Amino acid sequence: METGTNKTKQKPKYDLWQITAYMLGVAWRGRHWTVFTVGLSLALVTAGRTIAELLFAPAVLRVLEQGMALGRLLAVIGGFSMLLVALTFLQSYLSELNLFGKMNVRVDILDLSARKRAGTSYPNLLDKRFLDLSAKADRAGCTNNESVEAFWVSWGEILTNLFGFGAYLLLLSGLNAWLCLLVCATSVVSYLASRRINEWGYRHREEEAGYVKRLAYVQKVATDRQYGKDIRIFGLREWVEELWESTMRLYHGFLLRRETAYLWANVIDLALLLVRNGAAYAYLIWLTLEQGLPVSQFLLYFGAATGFAQWVSGILEKFAKLHKQCLDISTVREFLEYPEPFRFEDGLPLEKRLDTPYELRLEGVSYRYPGAEKDTIHKLDLTVRPGENLAIVGLNGAGKTTLVKLLCGFLDPTEGRVLLNGQDIRPYNRRDYYKLFAAVFQDFSVLSATVAENVAQCRTGIDEARVWHCLDEAGLTEKVQSLPKQLETQIGREVYEDGVELSGGQTQRLMLARALYKDAPVLVLDEPTAALDPIAENDIYQKYNEMTAGKTSLFISHRLASTRFCDRILYLKDGRVAEEGTHEELLKRGGGYADLFEVQSQYYREENEA
């Protein structure tokens, strides 16, 4: 677990006032004006109700002291009662109304966060800092009680306390000024202690996030059915439990340190409270006994002194709470403003045209993953000619998938350039560049949606005839026709109880149909038949030329026999093109490709003999 000192000294990028301006801007742009109007009205009504409650008893007592008529007494009681009922009703109404504005702002920020994750540059998904900020942004807005929405609650409470502070200050203006200063001074010290604790929590947030992330991962492994068979067959239960318990012990140690700090802050606050209230009460008792202060006035000042201290403490405590929330929202803002290494809307437009030949070229390209000690791809020069069927083969770790990611624009080289028709791809809108490619990747994803939606990758405007054609080319027509709702059958049971589970081979065929439906100029197939049996695999190979007609194709495979139909084969080793040519040429050369092919052929011969 990373808990280095460099993690504990991080400062927030934005302060309280910058975050307040930012949140007001989000609310204004979203036209959620009720957070201003209703929030301010609610603060006034809440403070007004508290002031009315303070004045109620002294007013009644004053009527009795002056010996006024019963009617006057009933009028005072009735007037205050009606006022309190009205203010209570209005407070409840405004509180409910205020929920919608706060929630709408939170939803807007959640939407911005979701769009950031879905549309961010691919390298950011490999960046630990980005992923950590993403997780924290999720936590800051996941419920109504988290910082993104609670921010408005805190500001409402601060305004309420400010209004109350002003009113009570007027009431106490006739008392000793030193008493008011004592109340303010002790409250400020209490606030500073509270703020110090909040800053401790922020400084150690990376440590806490590490424990939470690790616990969440262990919980996922323990409860996800994907791991269920492995846990049972390999007897991993005790190991998973020990991992959970050891991490929980570390997390408990962190919580103990944090709660100890909070305890000392509370002890200081309690001591200051005793000094503050004790001095106020002693002074009022002295005024009553020595100066003849009326009982009604004593009751009023007694309540005002207590309330004044609470208003001051409330202002400072709510600011401390708001400060902590702003630390969380600062993280959200940092996430939303995380720099994008790729150009998107600000890039040059690139139109996908099927009648335009596209040449891809790598010019002196090297790529090294963050934190790696050596290049995965090193000083590689490569030209993919228009309409060429190119195979990329090699052992695990040779750089095949990384090379494809560079060609597809998911990664920018750490050295060199990727060129499209002789032009560097970096100035282009990367999303336009992605439109040139259709792909079946090793780590494919299936949506909890219908068969048609998975193939077309959209919900409206689906060309069903084209979907069926692509399913037929991928060899999945018979399976889909056997499903209860055919194209409208839901895939997976994560969302829909009546969804169907496809086998690994069937899922791979579905992904192939999806790539064919896109009809892009460049088709990328990264181990597209890894989950297929030999007969099904051969069926795909027989249709390969038909599927790639008029397109440039990149075919990545471990099985060298599957590359016979390609125009050219690249044999990668240690991030370089070690050999290049057709299947027959490489076999005649007798190099690494031929050796690997012989090993694989021997395996298949032994299997057939068996």
Each language-model region and where it sits:
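Transmembrane helix-loop-helix hairpins at lipid-water interfaces of multipass membrane proteins
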Residues: 36-93, 169-201, 275-282, 286-296, ...
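Extended non-transmembrane interhelical loops and adjacent amphipathic helices
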Residues: 1-21, 103-149, 211-254, 326-339, ...
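Cytosolic ends of transmembrane helices, especially the final helix of ABC transmembrane type-1 domains
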Residues: 236, 280, 299-337
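Membrane-integrated ABC transporters
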Residues: 1-50, 70-75, 130-166, 214-216, ...
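C-terminal portion of ABC ATPase nucleotide-binding domains
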Residues: 486, 542, 549-550, 559, ...
